[in-house]
Regions:
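A generic structural motif
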Residues: 14, 59-65
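Short glycine-/aliphatic-rich beta-strand segments at the starts of folded cytosolic domains
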Residues: 8-31
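Short amphipathic alpha-helix segments
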Residues: 33-47
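Short, surface-exposed beta-strand-loop junctions and turns on beta-sheet-rich folds
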Residues: 22-23, 69-71
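Short acidic amphipathic segments
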Residues: 45-60
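Glycine-rich, charged/polar anion/phosphate-binding loops
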Residues: 1-3
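Charge-rich, low-aromatic oligomerization/scaffolding segments with amphipathic character
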Residues: 70-82
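Conserved short beta-strand edge segments in small beta-sheet-based binding/regulatory domains
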Residues: 84-87
Length: 87
């Protein structure tokens, strides 16, 4: 089914879910501006213009954008990166 963007109660956050496991185990991973992660997919998402922070857990990644950025192009870029990683 690929990557599925899903709205969240926060208009500045979208949850991107996949049928495949992205992160093993029961720990969540958060990356804030200026941080890096051992998970390259999160680092690549943080490089996108307009991304404020990312949160990953098992089969999803939630991307939080800056309030003044529109989702239109950003959703396409997030899905593209996740698909490049095989999700």
């Amino acid at each position: 089914m690929g990557v599925r963007p899903e709205a969240t109660p926060n208009p500045n956050a979208i949850k991107f879910t996949t049928d495949k496991m992205i992160f093993e185990g029961t720990n969540s991973i958060s990356v804030m501006s200026g941080d890096t992660s051992e998970h390259e997919i999160l680092n690549d998402l943080m490089k996108l213009d307009g991304v404020d922070n990312v949160f990953g857990y098992q089969n999803f990644i939630t991307v939080n954008k800056h309030f003044d950025v529109e989702w239109d192009d950003l959703v396409v870029e997030v899905v593209k990166i996740m698909e490049e990683y095989g999700y």
